[in-house]
């Protein structure tokens, strides 16, 4: 298990951990099944940064800062992955922009290029703005630390689910070829249940106003984020025929944005009373 965990961290982060000298598909599958737990570690790190920024920027007698802690939280997630997933999102945007005019094969070639085009820059800008804006809203509602934790786990869960047996690689080389179809359905289901359980527990014990209502909100965000990633994955499969490392990165970033949006939602008062949310 330790080898699989180290492999997961070396595949998904730039943390200074010693990974295996060689990663085969079997090991890659076990590592990708642990991707949500990598998200848990990253979420704890980013959540701590959000909380610390709130503390050091607080001004007595004034409303607490929300934008700066949100920017710091999103930045920490980008730094510990060296922008890997954002780069994948940018390449995915360029590939989608080229797909209709140039076809699947040319779009995949464009996704491999090191330069970023207009479509890639635009999609990264919009997704990051959504992440920062939604996280800022959750911070003002005193659930920012919980929100970034849930988003980090759910977005990495999207990568796990994208590597199940039903999803092929889009090309015969690269990260997609290494991990596509390697995660067993049972392991993916267990990962999903584990993320729901951790999200519920985190919501229940949240130091900034935890309780049953917050736990339900966190689980709802996991479900909606996972649903968004499923629909997006199906759409991308129709365009590219499989997954690549860039597609996984794009799924992670967009799922994180969707999860944060759910955590930021204002739920109507009758629904709050019915479900016990706050």
UniProtKB/Swiss-Prot annotation:
Q: Which UniProt keywords apply?
A: Cell membrane, Cobalamin biosynthesis, Magnesium, Membrane, Transferase, Transmembrane, Transmembrane helix
Listed under GO biological process in this entry are: cobalamin biosynthetic process
Molecular function (GO) terms for this protein are:
adenosylcobinamide-GDP ribazoletransferase activity; cobalamin 5'-phosphate synthase activity
Catalytic activity reported: alpha-ribazole + adenosylcob(III)inamide-GDP = adenosylcob(III)alamin + GMP + H(+); alpha-ribazole 5'-phosphate + adenosylcob(III)inamide-GDP = adenosylcob(III)alamin 5'-phosphate + GMP + H(+)
The membrane topology term of the UniProt record is: Multi-pass membrane protein
**Cofactor(s) demanded:** Mg(2+)
What are the TM regions of this chain, as residue ranges? Answer: 31-51, 66-86, 115-135, 148-168, 187-207, 215-237, 247-267
Q: Superkingdom of this entry's organism?
A: Bacteria
Major localization class = membrane
Under which pathway is this protein filed? Answer: Cofactor biosynthesis; adenosylcobalamin biosynthesis; adenosylcobalamin from cob(II)yrinate a,c-diamide: step 7/7
Q: Which family is it part of?
A: Belongs to the CobS family.
The protein's job, in short, is:
Joins adenosylcobinamide-GDP and alpha-ribazole to generate adenosylcobalamin (Ado-cobalamin). Also synthesizes adenosylcobalamin 5'-phosphate from adenosylcobinamide-GDP and alpha-ribazole 5'-phosphate.
Question: What is this protein's record name?
Answer: Adenosylcobinamide-GDP ribazoletransferase
Task: Identify the species of origin.
Answer: Frankia casuarinae (strain DSM 45818 / CECT 9043 / HFP020203 / CcI3)
């Amino acid at each position: 298990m330790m080898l699989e965990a180290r492999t997961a961290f070396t595949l998904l982060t730039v943390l200074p951990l010693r990974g295996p000298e060689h990663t085969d598909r079997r090991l890659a599958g076990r590592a990708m099944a642990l991707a949500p737990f990598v998200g848990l570690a990253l979420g704890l790190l980013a959540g701590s940064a959000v909380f610390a920024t709130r503390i050091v920027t607080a001004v007595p007698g004034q409303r607490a800062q929300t934008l700066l802690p949100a920017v710091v939280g999103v930045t920490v997630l980008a730094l510990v992955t060296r922008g890997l997933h954002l780069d994948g999102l940018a390449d995915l945007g360029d590939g989608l922009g080229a797909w209709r005019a140039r076809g699947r094969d040319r779009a995949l070639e464009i996704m491999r290029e090191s330069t970023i085009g207009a479509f890639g820059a635009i999609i990264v800008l919009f997704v990051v703005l959504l992440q920062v804006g939604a996280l800022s809203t959750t911070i003002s509602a005193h659930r920012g630390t919980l929100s970034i934790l849930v988003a980090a786990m759910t977005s990495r869960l999207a990568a796990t689910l994208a590597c199940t047996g039903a999803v092929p690689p889009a090309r015969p080389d690269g990260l997609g070829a290494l991990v596509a179809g390697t995660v067993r359905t049972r392991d993916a289901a267990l990962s999903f249940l584990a993320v729901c359980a951790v999200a519920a527990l985190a919501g229940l014990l949240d130091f900034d106003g935890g309780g049953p209502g917050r736990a339900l909100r966190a689980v709802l965000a996991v479900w909606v984020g996972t649903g968004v990633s499923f629909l997006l994955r199906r759409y991308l499969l129709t365009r590219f025929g499989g997954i690549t490392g860039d597609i996984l990165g794009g799924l992670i970033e967009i799922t994180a944005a969707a999860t944060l949006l759910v955590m930021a939602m204002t739920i109507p008062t009758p629904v709050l009373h019915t479900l016990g949310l706050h």
